[in-house]
Amino acid sequence: MSEHDGKVIAVVGATGLQGRAVTRRLLADGWAVRALTRDPAGKQARALAALGADVQRADAADEASLRLSFTGAHGVYSVQNHHISGYDGEIEQGRNVADAAAGASIRHLVYASAGPDVAGTGVGSWETKVAVTEHARNVEVPLTVLRPMAFMELMTDRKFYPAASVWHLMPKLMGPSRPVGWISVEDIAVIAAKAFTDPGAFTGRDLALVSDVRSIDECRAIWRDVTGRPPRRFAMPVWMFERFSGTDETTMWRWLRDNHVDLDTRPTQEIHPEALTVRQWLGAKKAPSRPGATGRGRGPLAV
């Protein structure tokens, strides 16, 4: 018998990259998971159902429907994606989740934020999360905020356009030797599961998640060591990238060029000592030598 038997975690955005990883980890740890999605008949939703998740349709733009979806749940994991909802929609959805969690007497809300948690950066996807976090802190629900830095998956996953983004425009606009904080989505999921298991150690905390700090030049060298060749780079012009992906990432990279971000790995390692370094992660993934320059996706930082 699992210590979590009878306790349900509702995952908002369960079919996205983070949501899928968190759902899988929670199921593996013995939680019952209510996977909330706009498309319960979709491929990703069906895969989660096959693992044992209770997949349900939910609309994060509708607080009343969320409150019904949260009924009887112990905790909620909340992640939004501005590539789907837009910036205003992300704020609305994130606030709705917090309000619905409070209304449903949820015992623990874990919110997936990102970035340095400072206002005024001009980076839309960071500003939205600052707004959602501020709102969530002011409602009556126990809260943990997780702020992962760059996903390691940005280096390999086709939907993030790595040849054009991470391996070309990011170093071009930010600088190839600027330090970058990295963490894998699977390690974020492990930490989220730990937060639900030990709420006393996590409630009220705002955690920047970084398991390794490597510049793009260092990541290129590690890639070469792992695969025997450098990562593929596609010299896409900035204007072209912004045309199909928007200006969020290019604004972010320019901001990171000119501003300091605390990239201390120790807090993450204290919580999750097995969190992977870039070298360990690339080695485990057997990184492909030719990541796609293009592909079907929602942008370089889809969540």
Residues of each region from the PLM?
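Short, conserved active-site loop motifs that form the nucleotide-linked donor/cofactor pocket
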Residues: 52-53, 143
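Hydrophobic "lid"/C-terminal helical patch
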Residues: 192, 196, 223, 253, ...
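Cofactor-binding loops of NAD(P)H-dependent oxidoreductases
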Residues: 58
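Oxidoreductase cofactor-interface core, primarily capturing Rossmann-like NAD(P)-dependent enzymes
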Residues: 2-47, 61-64, 68-71, 81-92, ...
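Amphipathic terminal alpha-helices
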Residues: 271-303
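Terminal hydrophobic/aromatic helix or amphipathic segment near a protein terminus
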Residues: 207-208, 220-262, 295-303
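Juxtamembrane extracytoplasmic segments of single-/few-pass membrane proteins
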Residues: 265-271
